Structure formats: structure tokens, C-alpha cells
């Protein structure tokens, strides 16, 4: 006869780099970048899970059980606003940097849920006492509240697409590329000008 293996809980599961996950609150709402905003400083909030890329996260290992948590759509990291460490510090996204404000520890519990702790502040990812769509995330001291427990699930379905979101992202990428071209061209132009100047005798 065959013995069925018990379903693995996240507490027993390794977060694999290159895979993507949803981070769900106790009421099933997931953590997302608000309004698929690709800008630095965009808020991180709760929302109904609609299987969009901006509701999915990668865990990038930074050593010793510490991770950077990267949004699948924007490519930016979950970060503490202004590197704050006090209760109520807002959590937002920021481009990846060697910053301690972007380091998080995933602490498993016996029931398969996790606590997500800022490695810098020693405080937990927390939606406050609110649960509705649009609730902005913060950090708060560990009070073992139900709102401080999260469920991490691997994304196995192909994410839904949004023409509007994809257009916004493509436009931003084009603008960034154009800026990089200008930056690269400027030193070359300055060098050419210097070379063209007659030597002063």
C-alpha cells in the first residue's frame, strides 16, 4: 500500500531563488505594490489576489537566513521608508541596493505560517489593525498578533497580464534607456571637445 506524504508547510520549505510567491495575510489578501507603480517609494499594501505579477515576490538570499524580497513586476525591493526602525515605519519599494533596510528574515511557525522580520529594525511586517484592500504595510514590534502572521505560497499559475500595466512598464524602461544613452554620450562628447581645443602655448 502507499502512504501519502503530508502536505509540506512553508516552515519545512526552502524559499527557492528564481521562483515567485504570494504573501497572504490572515484574511487571504495578498501583499502587492499599489497600482503596479514602478517608482521608488511606491507603497506596499494588501489587496485581493488577482494573480497579477505585482502581487508576487521573489526571495533573494542574502546569507544567514536573510532575504531581499523582490517584486516580480517592478523588480524593486521591499524596503523601510527612510531606513526607519520605529513602530509604524512605512514599508515601500526601492531599487535594489546594499542597504540593511532591504533585508528580511522569514521566521517559520509550527502551523505553517511565518513572521517576516526586518533584519535592521528587529520588527515585523504588519498591516496594523486594518484588513481591507489598500491597507498600507508597516513594521511593528512583535506582539504575536494574528495580523503579524503571513502565509507564503509558491505561484504555480501563469500570472494575468494587464495591457495598461505593461505599457507603463515599457514606457519607463524606454525612458531609462534613453537616459542611459545620454549619460554615456556626455563623457564622450566632453572628451571630443577637449581633444579639439588647441593647446595653450
Where are these regions (language model features)?
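Composition-driven recognition of long, low-complexity, acid-poor segments enriched in small hydrophobic
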Residues: 159-201
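Lectin-like carbohydrate-binding module/patch detector with strong preference for beta-trefoil
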Residues: 5-164, 168-169
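Short, Lys/Arg-enriched N-terminal segments with co-localized hydrophobic residues
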Residues: 1-3
Amino acid at each position: 500500500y502507499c502512504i501519502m506524504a503530508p502536505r509540506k508547510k512553508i516552515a519545512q520549505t526552502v524559499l527557492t531563488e528564481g521562483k515567485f510567491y504570494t504573501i497572504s495575510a490572515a484574511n487571504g489578501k495578498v501583499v502587492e505594490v499599489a497600482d503596479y507603480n514602478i517608482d521608488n517609494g511606491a507603497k506596499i499594501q494588501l489587496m485581493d489576489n488577482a494573480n497579477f505579477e505585482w502581487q508576487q515576490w521573489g526571495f533573494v538570499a542574502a546569507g544567514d537566513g536573510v532575504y531581499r524580497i523582490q517584486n516580480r513586476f517592478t523588480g524593486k525591493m521591499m524596503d523601510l521608508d527612510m531606513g526607519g526602525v520605529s513602530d509604524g515605519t512605512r514599508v515601500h519599494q526601492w531599487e535594489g541596493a546594499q542597504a540593511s533596510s532591504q533585508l528580511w528574515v522569514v521566521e517559520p511557525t509550527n502551523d505553517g505560517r511565518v513572521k517576516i522580520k526586518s533584519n535592521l529594525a528587529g520588527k515585523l511586517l504588519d498591516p496594523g489593525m486594518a484588513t481591507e484592500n489598500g491597507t498600507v504595510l508597516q513594521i511593528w514590534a512583535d506582539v504575536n498578533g494574528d495580523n503579524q502572521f503571513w502565509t507564503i505560497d509558491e505561484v504555480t499559475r501563469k500570472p494575468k497580464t494587464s495591457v495598461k500595466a505593461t505599457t507603463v512598464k515599457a514606457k519607463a524602461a524606454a525612458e531609462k534607456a534613453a537616459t542611459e544613452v545620454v549619460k554615456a554620450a556626455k563623457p564622450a562628447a566632453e572628451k571630443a571637445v577637449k581633444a579639439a581645443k588647441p593647446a595653450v602655448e
